[in-house]
């Protein structure tokens, strides 16, 4: 059965690049969101069991999205994928419940390693 995976990034290029970086043969049903508000709705609609989340976006950024997921106790596993590699950002997203933080651009090997480590793959 396909796993609902959501990629949330305001950049269409980054969304496509992330989709191409997912492991070969991983049975997923892929959805996309351009900002945190869209991501929250997609999760509520059952489209985001796993969420790859950017931090810097308009409308609702990644930090706000994580906070909203926690506040509403939404059922999703969040992996942050961002160019913002400041130690403070890393600590904040982990404190908000993210499984891990991957630096953009995300390599296939790194994504596979994170998914395997958390028993997702």
Region spans (language model):
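Acidic catalytic/metal-coordinating carboxylates
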Residues: 35-38, 61-64
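Receiver (REC) domain active-site loop signature in two-component systems and cognate sites
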Residues: 57
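Active-site beta3 strand of CheY-like receiver
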Residues: 46-52
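Two-component/phosphorelay signaling modules centered on CheY-like receiver
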Residues: 12-31
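Alpha4 helix (beta4-alpha4-beta5 surface) of REC/receiver domains from two-component response regulators
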Residues: 64, 85-100
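C-terminal output helix
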Residues: 106-116
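Conserved sequence signature across two-component system core domains
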Residues: 8-9, 33, 51
């Amino acid at each position: 059965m396909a796993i609902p995976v959501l990629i949330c990034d305001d950049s269409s290029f980054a969304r496509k690049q992330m989709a191409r970086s997912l492991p070969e043969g991983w049975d997923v049903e892929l959805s996309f969101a351009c900002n945190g508000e869209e991501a929250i709705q997609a999760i509520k609609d059952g489209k985001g069991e796993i969420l790859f989340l950017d931090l810097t976006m308009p409308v609702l950024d990644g930090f706000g999205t994580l906070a909203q997921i926690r506040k509403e106790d939404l059922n999703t596993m969040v992996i942050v994928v961002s160019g913002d590699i400041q130690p403070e950002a890393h600590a904040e997203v982990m404190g908000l419940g993210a499984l891990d933080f991957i630096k953009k651009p995300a390599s296939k090997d790194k994504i596979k390693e994170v998914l395997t480590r958390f028993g997702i793959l």
